[in-house]
Design a protein with these regions (language model features):
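A short, Lys/Arg-rich alpha-helix, primarily the initiator
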Residues: 1-18
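Short alpha-helical DNA-recognition segment
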Residues: 18-36
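Short, charged recognition helix plus adjacent turn
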Residues: 11, 36, 54, 64-69
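DNA major-groove recognition helix of helix-turn-helix/homeodomain DNA-binding modules
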Residues: 47-62
């Protein structure tokens, strides 16, 4: 499995037909933050990662590249 966070996030957004804006709103961050993650310029903090897992009912391990979706 690919373990690069930006690639994992790109794939997740595409597979779930989510825009950066919709994803950001669902996890409580700004779209600009999601853009930075997608560009590989930043990585999510603990709270953002937790919110991703809770908002989309996906293990944080998936976003970390440890487990498959």
């Amino acid at each position: 499995m690919e373990n690069n966070f930006s690639e994992i996030l790109k794939d997740f957004l595409a597979e779930n037909n989510l825009s950066q804006v919709a994803f950001a709103k669902a996890i409580g961050v700004k779209q600009s933050q999601v853009s930075e993650w997608l560009k590989g310029k930043a990585k999510p903090d603990y709270d953002s990662l937790k919110n991703m897992a809770l908002a989309f009912n996906v293990s944080a391990d998936y976003f970390l590249g440890i487990k498959e979706y």
